[in-house]
């Protein structure tokens, strides 16, 4: 039978699923993250070989990865081809993976909110527009790393309640010098910053159990407001340009820039938003608050990880 292997690779881990021609999931597993920007060919081949001792060789391999730019595609393609000499290999970025997982072959605005953040306007086949996310130093509004950054700023500058600072230092077992060192001297500061988010999520859940006027609820509310602010910036800095573009007339577009194609009106103007990632999953309430209540943009779907959606997408693609 024809097998398809789907790999979804983030910076921390790679999820794998082997599916049959009927769309049944034969096997799932995960292995460490594969990022062509940070890893050598040998490293990547090692990861692929270690884990993928498959009983059945796939006929097709679909690889979706963070750090897979157009320039990186040929390299990733050849590494996968070495690992699966018999298979037809397709390599795509994680943004198209998210769009396919969320919307299949329908149009929509697809977003990733995990350690980093990204978004695109998707027409059901291709990414039509992609606001550059710029990473956690220059951008990545609403991401885990940026929320961690805002949190540390708040506890050390004193704009968040002092009780939160005490609780976080106890929870993490870290002190001020160690934190500064992790952010400025050690590698992978973005992962360290994002690792604060489970604590933030826990504090909000805890606070909601307490009555009005309690310190716990006060702490939770201050964190909730911090998250709302970051999601608001994610919306304004990234999504507004897609919403404007879709609503713009052909005349408006031609004035904007030469060579920019107008949005296909048959796809509709009121697109729904879709989100993939742990931050969207854990902070669904403030996310819906900003997108739906504030800006009247409907969220169609929030997926913690894209794999289920990718399996559905590739099961529908016959042959």
What function would you assign to each model-found segment?
Residues 62-69:
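Polybasic, low-complexity association/targeting segments
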Residues 66, 115, 278:
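Cofactor-binding loop segments of dinucleotide-utilizing enzymes, especially the Rossmann-like FAD-
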Residues 69-166:
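Phosphate-binding/catalytic loop of phosphoryl-transfer enzymes
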